[in-house]
Amino acid sequence: VLDASDYGMVGMLAIFSAIASTIQESGFTAALTNQKEIKHEDYNAVFWFSSLTGVLFYLILFFCAPLIAEFYDKPELIGLSRIVFLGFLFGGFGIASNAYLFKTLMVKERAKIDIVSLICSGFIGVTLSLNGFAYYGLAVQTITYIGIGSLLKFIYAPWKPTFQIDLHPLKLMFSFSSKLILTNIFTQISNNI
């Protein structure tokens, strides 16, 4: 159904996705987990930061899609990358909820989320691939996994964001998370080049 070139098309975008996702998460999940006392404002700041950076990265990469396609000399990457990069929009909404689930040891809930996301996205990806959508099936599978996972994390986590946008708590977490960002970016670059 899928051949190596289909995986290669999606794989070409992996470096962009990996670096942008690392910056979007910014090590704040680990920073929240590391804090002894976490307030609503801390989770809220991470939620708004990751959501807004998700929108920003999607817009940047959406408009850079022709440049990415030109770099690889693959015009098909324009449409494909614009679909794959939707993961930033969906993923940003689940980062703070995921940190809450992790911090409060809601392991059973996280396992359910992963299983449901995997089964649903796998079904959709296989169905699309069997119907001739090739690498688009892989792309939709990926964003479906991210989207369902983010939605379920939001549902399962008792914490909910509010519209009181205050990014000040991020400054306090940044001393811890900044080291993780750099390490993770270098790791992603070395793994994807």
Label each residue range with its predicted role.
Residues 108, 112, 151-192:
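Interhelical loop/hinge segments that connect adjacent transmembrane helices in multipass membrane
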Residues 29-30, 65, 98-102, 125, ...:
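Interfacial helix-capping/hinge residues at the ends of transmembrane alpha-helices
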Residues 19-20, 59, 63, 74-100, ...:
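Alpha-helical transmembrane segments of multi-pass membrane proteins
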Residues 7-8, 42-43, 77, 135, ...:
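Primarily residues marking transmembrane-helix entry/exit sites
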Residues 64, 68, 190-193:
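Hydrophobic/aromatic end-of-helix segments at the C-terminal termini of transmembrane alpha-helices
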Residues 9-13, 21-66, 79-85, 109, ...:
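Membrane-water interface segments that mark the loop-to-transmembrane alpha-helix transition
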Residues 1-14, 66, 70, 78, ...:
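Membrane-interface helix-loop junctions in multi-pass transport and translocation proteins
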Residues 31-40, 90-113, 131, 136, ...:
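Membrane-interface junctions at transmembrane-helix termini in multi-pass inner-membrane proteins
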